[in-house]
Amino acid sequence: MDLGIDGRVALVLGASRGLGRAVAEALGREGVRVALAARSVDELEAAAAGIGGETAVVGVDTGDAEAVAALPERVAAALGPVEILVLNTGGPPGGAALEADLEAWTEAYRSLVLAPVILAERCVPGMRERGWGRIVSISSTSIREPIPNLTLSNANRAATAGFLATLAREVAADGVTVNTIATGRFATERLASLHGSIEAAEEQARADVPAARLGRPEEYGDLVAFVCSERAAYLTGTAIPLDGGLTRSS
C-alpha cells in the first residue's frame, strides 16, 4: 500500500531508542525525510544510520523551552519545513500520588505538556498554510485508565491529550490531522526498567494482556506511519488504543 508520504519531512522526538526509533524507521521506509531528535546525539546518529533515506540528527532537551522552540527551524534548515510532527517523551519517574515534589512536577510538565504546546505553536501555522500536516502523540493508555504508581505520567499525558484533541478540531478543515496513540505494553527499555527486566514484563503480559504478549516496536512504527499517511486523512481528534486489548474502557 502506498501511504502517499514519500518526500514529506518529519520531526520525531525521542527517536534514539524504543518506540520513537521504531517510528522514525517506519517513516523512513516510506520515503519520509526524518529529523531524529533526543538528548543523546551519539544514539541518534546510530539510529539514523539504520534509516535508508535522508535524515538529520538534532540534539535537544525537551525540558528546555528555548531549545524546543528552536527545533523546527533547525529541522527546516536541514530538511525542509516540518510536515509530520511525532511527539514522544520518555519517563517521567514512577511514584505514588503524593510522593513527587514540586521540582519533579515542574520537570514533567515542561517535557510532557509544554514542549508539545511549543512545537504545535511553531509547526501548525506552516501546516495550515500548506494545507497538509500530521501530528501524532506517542502517549499511554493512562490517558484513559490511570496506571498505579505513575502519577506524573498519568496527569501530564492526560493534559497533553486534551490539548491535542482541542487543537485537532480547530485545524481539521485545513488538512491537518492530530491524533494520540494510547500505548500499551511494548518491548522497550522503558518497560523493562519498570518491571525489572523484559522477561518479567513478558510474563506479566501473558497473564493480563488479552493478546497474551508484549507489543513489538515495529508494529507500533507501522501504525504511526499509517496515521501519518494520506490514507488516514479523515482520522483526527482521537486517541487510538494500541495495547493488545488491555484497556477496558471504550
Locate predicted features:
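Short C-terminal tail/terminal secondary-structure segment
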Residues: 1, 145, 225, 236-250
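Conserved glycine-rich cofactor-binding loop
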Residues: 16-17
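A short, exposed helix-loop element centered on a Lys and neighboring polar residues
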Residues: 120-121, 165
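Alpha-helical segment proximal to the catalytic Tyr-Lys
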Residues: 125, 169-170, 233
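Short, small/polar-rich loop/turn modules that mediate ligand/substrate recognition or access, typified
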Residues: 172, 177, 235-237
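Substrate-binding pocket helix/loop in short-chain dehydrogenase/reductase
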Residues: 96-109, 201, 205
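Catalytic loop of short-chain dehydrogenase/reductase
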Residues: 136-160, 164-173, 185
